[in-house]
Amino acid sequence: MITTHPLHPNDLEEDKFHDECGVFGVFGHKDAAAHTALGLHALQHRGQESAGIVSYDGTHFNAHRSLGLVGDNFSSEKVMERLPGEVAIGHNRYATTGETTLRNVQPLFAEFDFGGLAIGHNGNITNAHALRKVLVKRGCIFQSTLDTEIIVHQIAISQFSDVLDRMIDALNQIQGAYSLVAMTEDALIGLRDPLGVRPLVLGRIDRANILCSETCALDIIGAEYIRDVEPGEIVVVSAKGIRSIKPFNKKNKRFCIFEYIYFARPDSQVEGRNVYDVRKCIGAELAKESHVDADIIVPVPDSGVPAAIGYAEQSNINFELGITRNHYVGRTFIEPTDQIRHLGVRLKHNANRGYIEGKRVILVDDSIVRGTTSEKIVAMVRAAGAKEIHMRISSPPTTHSCYYGIDTPEPEQLLASRMDIDLMAKHIGVDSLAFISMRGLYRAIGETDRNPENPQYCDACFSGEYPIELTDRNGGPLPAQLSLLTEQV
């Protein structure tokens, strides 16, 4: 009998940052849940560990949550039939806080005195443990280990009567980066934190309105992009139309710069810029800053492709797909023996000897995190006969961890925090290594330079300058989280 077993991400040696979540909401469409499932499918790159949808049919809230990919869990008619109604919200998750268990699948749902509320959150609350400690002392019982549940409890204890006032009151207690969608019995609500670190856009299809993380999720259902939700803005969609509220003190925008480099899908429009175009511009700037004579430019697929194209166009060196990626390696594998695990990166990538042998190769990738993947890719390309290997990275050295909703290693695990560039080059086995400068990155995005007094983006993973207070991080060891549900579901 053939059996399948869980294949841990470490088995694939994927050394990348991971965004935590994607969110999607629909108001006023007869196929709200189906559109939400399609939207989540388009946002699958933002979270692959779990997905959930909650709908409202005018009388009842209905929910379906599952571990795994959207297509594996929301493609059947039976599932869609259990999610009736013209309003729905959905959520994809990659865990940065809390375990990957069914009880941690969003959207979360709770009954209040004003009615039901479902909520899905992309980001990270940086004072979650401090707030949780206070809430537990007040008698709150947590059903998950999600920081999102902090928001739910803060809404529950608010003394205001109106649901929006209660949400605003709750969010005034919260520090962190967040974009979220919520659903009540008569409204779809979307909002961004005052710095606008995480993305959220507004769209329309027929007479229905959409809120979602990226424009690629609008494209898949044929919806029209209307605009970005502004930092600190709450958008309320109801039968009365669309209402905008800006209840928070205005702050300088600090959108996550890594959305342009890696997280967002290349076909999305982010903050008014096409992501694919920005990545090509980054590659061109990288070529200007760190030219080296070579025979071919080879991207590390898939995330290195746009920057490699830009590098090739700027340097007039041939672009070749010298590495092929296997897109069908999932989260399970037939009998994952130690031998298979030791294959590591070769499960996903293979060098094309016919194009690499005897060539001076420039490898282009989006980032180096721990360096484990880069080291193995370089060894693979070297084994395919490359004469020289020069690596070019379309982001500055990643020297600091992210605490705003991105799954990153601790600083001591980041290669660039432990080594200078020459040592990194020796460690991963390349003839030369170069990263785009901070100035070059900002120029590629459309700025003249980085403003050191007031940076235009959140670039804390490169600069170490955190625009939102890290209350939990700076408060010492984090306490264990209290929950009645301690067993994994």
What is the meaning of each model-derived region?
Residues 31-33, 96-97, 127, 197-198, ...:
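Flexible loop/turn segments at secondary-structure boundaries
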Residues 169, 216-217, 224-225, 229-233, ...:
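Phosphate/diphosphate-binding loops
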Residues 171, 186-187, 204, 222-228, ...:
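PRPP-dependent phosphoribosyltransferase catalytic core
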Residues 120, 183, 191-192, 203, ...:
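Generic beta-strand/beta-sheet core signal
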Residues 74, 144, 149, 319-330, ...:
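A conserved beta-strand->alpha-helix junction
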Residues 316-361, 371-372, 399-405:
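Short, glycine/charge-rich flexible loops or terminal/linker lids adjacent to PRPP-binding catalytic cores
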